[in-house]
Every structure is written in C-alpha cells, then in structure tokens.
Amino acid sequence: MKLMTMPSEFQKALPILTKIKEAGYEAYFVGGSVRDVLLERPIHDVDIATSSYPEETKAIFNRTVDVGIEHGTVLVLENGGEYEITTFRTEDIYVDYRRPSQVSFVRSLEEDLKRRDFTVNALALDENGQVIDKFRGLIDLKQKRLRAVGKAEERFEEDALRIMRGFRFAASLDFDIEAITFEAMRSHSPLLEKISVERSFTEFDKLLMAPHWRKGISAMIACQAYDYLPGLKQQEAGLNHLIVSLKDNFTFSDYHQAWAYVMISLAIEDPKSFLKAWKTSNDFQRYVTKLIALYRIRQERSFEKLDIYQYGKKMASLVEDLRKAQSLSVDMDRINTLDQALVIHDKHDIVLNGSHLIKDFGMKSGPQLGLMLEKVELAIVEGRLDNDFTTIEAFVREELAT
C-alpha cells in the first residue's frame, strides 16, 4: 500500500529520513503515527526508526540530545522540530514482566517491528509513502481488529502493561480484540500486579478519556483484569454500573470527572484512599474528592450560592454533565445565575483583610481572627453584606460587641 499524499507532519520530517538514507542507512516512520494516518486520525508524535546506531545517528546531525541512548533513542533538533530517532533493536528476556534485561541494536527493520505489541502498531512508512507491513497489520486495520504481533502469550509475558494498552486501544480506536490475543490477555492479567501503579494509571486514564471507553471497560471486565488493579478487586458490578448508568453517547469532559464517576459507580467510601492507592498527586486527590462531595450535595438538593462560591462554576458544571448523562434533572441556568450573583469569587477579593482587623480593631492573629474573617466572607457571599470597607468595618464592630 502506498499513500497518495504525505500528511504535513511527515512532510516536515522527510528531510530527516533523507539525511539518514544519504548517510547509507535505512529510516522509516513507525508506530502509532503511521497507524493514525491510515485511520485518518490526528497525528500526535512522529517517531522514526533507523538502522543507524546511536553514535552513527549523532554523527549525521549537528544538534542532538541523548534522551534514551541506552535504548537506542536520540533526540534530533532539525528544521525547527524535535524528532526522536531510535535504532532498530531486539530485546532479551524481560525481567519482572516489565523491562528487557538487555537491548541489542540490529540493522533489520523486521527484527525491530516483531518486538512491538499489536500488528496495527507494527507498521512502517518510507520516504515515498510506501507502507511496510510485515505482520498483516493493514488487514487488521481494515477489519478494526487488535491482534498481538507473533505469539500473544510472549508479548504479554514480556510486558504485562500491554494488556492495559490493549484495553486502551480498544477504547480509543473502537477495535475488537482478536480471540487468541484476548485469551492471552485474560490468562496473563494477574501479571498486572507486577506493573508499576503509575504506568497502569496512565493507561486507565487514557482509556477513560477515549471516545469508546465502554468498549475498553467491557474488555477489562471480560478479562477479569480489574481484580489486579488498585481498589478494583471484586468490583465487576460497579464497573458494569459505570457502563450502563450513562447515556451511550456520553464521553467524559476531563479526567477529574471520569475518575470521580468511577468512584461514584463503585460506591467508594473513601475516595482519597482509593486515589492514593493509584499514586495520584495530592492536587488531583483534592479536586476529585471535592467533585464527588459536590455531586452528593446535588443529589440531595439544588445548588445554592455558597456551593458555587466554595466549589466553583466549572466543578458544578461537571456535576450537571454527569446528571444529564444519567437523565436526571439539570439546571445550568441556575449555576450561571448564581455565579453572576456572586460579589466575590475568592476571599482575596474582600476589600478588608486580617491586617486591617489587627491594626484597626486590635485583634490578635489566631482562631478568633480567622473566625471573624470567615463571618465576613460568608455574609458577603450570602448577600447580607456589601464588599465595602466602611460597611465591613461596621459589621465587625457589631460582631465584636455581641
């Protein structure tokens, strides 16, 4: 198969391939970018594979950076762009089902492609637009099928994260997993416990944000892979609820919303501990935990002005999106009205602060001062007090007198 026209991302990188070939080596576009071009999807990263060894690659170009030279990767700075160029390689026995014990550089494109995970990711493209397909990846693309390169059992024994990648690709590409590949994923799912939580989180996160995330979750359920992921053991019912409780065409607005609804569906009692098990950042834990709290408030009643002030318009909108996807009542107009009615959106918007209370009223720093500032803040938010210096001073005097 030959492309009639090269996408602009590849055209810009063609001089890189040309330079390498003029130096006497082979060079090809490889991986996900080739797959995405053939599927008419946006290209995110342009990866280049070559028969030149790292030091040979560095000798060809003036500006290079060693970003992973032990694995054969050199970053080339050329034509206003940055390109990762990786030497063809083979990999020895994997240790801990995660990483190869040794990487060996080779001159053969086929040897390099056979170590990849799925046939649709094992395609290469030369400078003339000719697709090199050693493992029937083009047929799998046409039939929307995800199939492991070579022996599926070996691919997942080498790196068990490929199981999570399989779920993610099913979700992002809307592909079905080929039967032998699926069975190998199922039988090797216990190996996911060997994978770092951070790597699994990245794949699960991408799955949740994919347009066909239900397909990925369904495959995960069918493989019983969830039993080997943090906080998901024996959560088949919760994951099924996640799939069926939202409208078929619903996709998550952002990953905070996605993870919040995962925990809502699973009826997680301690969201922070659940997210800690996934080794997420403290900021992520705080935001998602607040989002769940606001969701539960909304289950009980309509939003009030204080809710919008404390949680923000964006978070309230994420909650309403989830309610709409469940065919529950929504009121975006109310959110907008309440937000517009807020005199302040943050305590720093208040014209009087703690320094003024210490200076003008002789208050001391401590709990009493903090409590007074909270009273002022609440009164302004609820509309009982104008955000005016003189008015606030009068309010404080009255409070101190009681």
UniProtKB/Swiss-Prot annotation:
Q: Does the keyword Protease apply?
A: no
Q: Does the keyword Transcription apply?
A: no
Question: Which InterPro entries does the record cross-reference, listed alphabetically?
Answer: Bact_CCA-adding_enz_type3_sf (IPR050264), CCA-adding_enz_C (IPR032810), CCA-adding_enz_firmicutes (IPR023068), NT_sf (IPR043519), PolA_pol_head_dom (IPR002646), PolyA_RNA-bd (IPR032828)
Q: Which reaction does it catalyse?
A: a tRNA precursor + 2 CTP + ATP = a tRNA with a 3' CCA end + 3 diphosphate; a tRNA with a 3' CCA end + 2 CTP + ATP = a tRNA with a 3' CCACCA end + 3 diphosphate
Miscellaneous field = A single active site specifically recognizes both ATP and CTP and is responsible for their addition.
Reported function: Catalyzes the addition and repair of the essential 3'-terminal CCA sequence in tRNAs without using a nucleic acid template. Adds these three nucleotides in the order of C, C, and A to the tRNA nucleotide-73, using CTP and ATP as substrates and producing inorganic pyrophosphate. tRNA 3'-terminal CCA addition is required both for tRNA processing and repair. Also involved in tRNA surveillance by mediating tandem CCA addition to generate a CCACCA at the 3' terminus of unstable tRNAs. While stable tRNAs receive only 3'-terminal CCA, unstable tRNAs are marked with CCACCA and rapidly degraded.
Protein family: Belongs to the tRNA nucleotidyltransferase/poly(A) polymerase family. Bacterial CCA-adding enzyme type 3 subfamily.
Q: How does it assemble?
A: Homodimer.
Please report the name of this protein according to its UniProt entry. Answer: CCA-adding enzyme
